[in-house]
Amino acid sequence: MGIQGLAKLIADVAPSAIRENDIKSYFGRKVAIDASMSIYQFLIAVRQGGDVLQNEEGETTSHLMGMFYRTIRMMENGIKPVYVFDGKPPQLKSGELAKRSERRAEAEKQLQQAQAAGAEQEVEKFTKRLVKVTKQHNDECKHLLSLMGIPYLDAPSEAEASCAALVKAGKVYAAATEDMDCLTFGSPVLMRHLTASEAKKLPIQEFHLSRILQELGLNQEQFVDLCILLGSDYCESIRGIGPKRAVDLIQKHKSIEEIVRRLDPSKYPVPENWLHKEAHQLFLKPEVLDPESVELKWSEPNEEELVKFMCGEKQFSEERIRSGVKRLSKSRQGSTQGRLDDFFKVTGSLSSAKRKEPEPKGSTKKKAKTGAAGKFKRGK
């Protein structure tokens, strides 16, 4: 779920924090991608006649086709992706996971009714609601990525929290996910729609946390409390407090504790055994991988092993897979050129980005840095 209504709220009250870019704008950028979110998108979108793709044994293959071709598209545009997979969900998420199970059970009933009535559109709608990323999906995608020469990481807990940690450490430029709580975990830059279907023609949305905080007049701890009031995966919110009211309350009272102290409990009853303090702590200090221990390497694809896996086991067209491998290899040759701003130490924020740093002599001959370009947030 992420944070309820956060994207719309930012668009309404801090529109300058959002920038829309074409995928070509990210040439030379390293990006940490929420793998489970991407796989879920592939299972929903990569279909034939409303059904997921399958091989002759009835095994789902939509996730593999999506991962293969979307990753190639990113590489062809000079993006260096690293996929981050979910680990064990935090205990605080158990309530949300239980609700999801209930919704799945209800969708199963509605699907059976739609099938009995022969309502094709309803069948497709409820079938998609039953989509769930499994361990097998994850394992197969990891195997595919290793054969493609694309790095992946296993997060100890929530993938988006580890993606945020990688951005904060300068290992990558941005975190790519549809879950807005990546900002709540402190990612300086969030990208949405990066792995969306090309046919949808959605521009990539880039959210800048520093500008969000600046426009709202909040610090990170206050922003976390705002997100908890909006509704997160880790605890309930106060019924009756909408996005606009939540912003006003946080701006005025600065913390959930002070808001609760001043609220009329008859109008805005606080949830029983409310775990907002625990959720607050989880967002500020999540369990994440150690960015300093991470070494990201992109290597040549293993064409024969890819053909063996994708064609021999999963029954994709050999001609298409070999063609994809050639595109991937060619893209690696083109992406070795670094971004210009990787050659300089650039500081500043969105508001100060117009100031130019003096160009050091011979700087164009220096080796490009591994990480993202300091605090400079332009996706050029």
From Swiss-Prot:
Could you say which EC number(s) this protein's record lists? Answer: 3.1.-.-
Binding-site list for Mg(2+) 2? 179, 181, 233
Q: Residues where Phosphoserine occurs?
A: 187, 197, 255, 293, 335
Region Disordered, residue ranges: 327-380
Cofactor or coenzyme needed: Mg(2+)
Assigned protein family? Belongs to the XPG/RAD2 endonuclease family. FEN1 subfamily.
Database matches in HAMAP family: Fen (MF_00614)
Q: What is this protein called?
A: Flap endonuclease 1
Its gene name is FEN1
